Amino acid sequence: MIRYLRGLVLKKEAGGFVLLAGGVGFFLQAPTPFLQALEEGKEVGVHTHLLLKEEGLSLYGFPDEENLALFELLLSVSGVGPKVALALLSALPPRLLARALLEGDARLLTSASGVGRRLAERIALELKGKVPPHLLAGEKVESEAAEEAVMALAALGFKEAQARAVVLDLLAQNPKARAQDLIKEALKRLR
């Protein structure tokens, strides 16, 4: 099992990227926020999950063990494949996704592409209370600026859950960000 690779980002493609490691180019599928953060020509370490399917081997890459653990937890639900798991990790920051799973918040899970009400309810039911505590560590408390940014994004027509997820992720990176900065960066991610 390949659990970690370090190498050069050779090329970014739709839904994944090619990582040159040890003279071999590996294609890794990855969540959208991770893909957007990657730069071609830069070295990166990637936590991986290798999946054997009828069509062959598929490799999935994540920026940290937290994302990888959530991906594997989601795959444990019947009816959830790698495409849905990646969609959830692309739509919601890891800590918000972990919180939604812990609390069984199916409504928040439906903000991911390809996750309908029934599937969200199944995920929420099967994983409610099963999220390891370390995935919730370091949760950030929302600020007034974050709440203002979420309301502004909702007024612009974005789903509140999706806007909140992106704003919380941005706030985790910069806890002192002002509302207008959060809105500006969130718009880049949401478009």
UniProtKB/Swiss-Prot annotation:
GO annotation, cellular component aspect: cytoplasm; Holliday junction helicase complex; Holliday junction resolvase complex
InterPro entries reported for this sequence: DNA_helicase_Holl-junc_RuvA_I, Hlx-hairpin-Hlx_DNA-bd_motif, NA-bd_OB-fold, RuvA, RuvA_2-like, RuvA_C, RuvA_C_sf
Activity over temperature: Retains HJ-binding ability after an hour at 90 degrees Celsius.
GO terms, molecular function: ATP binding; four-way junction DNA binding; four-way junction helicase activity
Domain of life: Bacteria
TM regions (residue ranges): none
Residue ranges of the region described as Flexible linker: 132-143
Quaternary state and interactors: Homotetramer; 2 tetramers associate head to head with an empty space between them large enough to hold a Holliday junction. Domain III interacts with RuvB. Electron microscopic images suggest 2 closely interacting RuvA tetramers sandwich the HJ DNA; each RuvA tetramer associates with an RuvB hexamer. Forms 2 complexes with Holliday junction (HJ) DNA which probably have 1 and 2 RuvA tetramers per complex (called complex I and complex II). Forms a complex with RuvB.
Entry protein name: Holliday junction branch migration complex subunit RuvA
Species assigned in the record: Thermus thermophilus (strain ATCC 27634 / DSM 579 / HB8)
